[in-house]
Amino acid sequence: MTRIESTDRATEQRDALVGRLFEAAIGAMEVATIYTGDRLGLYQALDEAGPATPSQIAAAAGIHERYAREWLEQQAVAGILAVEDPAAEATERRYLLPAAYREIFLERDSLNYLGGLLRLVVGASRPLDAVLAAYRTGGGVPYPDFGVDTREGIAAMNRPMFVNLLGSEWLPAMADIHARLQADPPARVADIGCGTGWSSIAIARAYPTVTVEGFDLDDASIAQARRNVAGAGLAGRVTFHIRDAADPELVGRYDLVTAFETIHDIARPVEALRVMRGLLADGGAVLIAD
């Protein structure tokens, strides 16, 4: 009896894992089709055109009609798009993005926006051959090798939190720091692992007198951060530097040192935390969100 029960339990465990991995594989392919629609502007085209045929979406997005039709049909079967007239000929069916899903794909400042996360998933898979080689050799895979999808995916995934929460909830929850950021003389903030700069920009927008210095080791991220801050009109108060957060020669005195969604990515996190502590002015604080 014990052996039969054990066998039944093993079968249940096996079947559960088979089902889970099968669903994960289908989900991975679905992510790829969503990535395709995002990168080609197909969701945007649907949003602007309303119910539209494959040829109309193809013209709006600048792609071939056959590929537009295949993508639209797949998205409808996946339950992402709706079909207004399913009985029509394949070339005449009109597709639309349900209003309930608009936030997920198009509203980049919304906390429900998932385009960044899905782009990150695709980007993280690109250097798998290099990751396999690193396992064999003990080497590493430099962050730039993960490419633009990883970099911009992370930025787009984190941006809504900074836009909606950083200046209105997170920092005000630290009453003493919130007061210091509004006081004279103007406070100084160091934003460690700033990436493309959205956290630094959010701090500067929330506290109009502070100066923010962002630090990141990735050249491409800092270049984008500088473009972002110029577009935000805050270049006079927000500056960015290509520096290693774990470098003991990183010095300064700051009223607030922040690290948002970055400690888990730093090769030497303990050293980075030590440097962050050393950057504090008297009465300053370190804020880590990870």
Regions found by a protein language model. Give the residues of each.
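Conserved beta-strand signature within the Rossmann-like core of class I S-adenosyl-L-methionine
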Residues: G283-D290
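A short glycine-rich, Lys/Arg-flanked "PGG" loop and its adjoining helix->strand segment in the class I
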Residues: V270-D282
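Short acidic, hydrophobic short linear motifs in intrinsically disordered regions
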Residues: P51-A59
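Conserved Class I S-adenosyl-L-methionine-dependent methyltransferase catalytic core
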Residues: D8, E12, R20-A45, A60, ...
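Conserved adenosyl
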Residues: T2, A124-E271
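Short helix-to-turn junction characteristic of helix-turn-helix DNA-binding domains
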Residues: L46-G50, A204
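Alpha-helix C-caps/helix-loop-beta hinges
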Residues: A49, V77-A78, G283
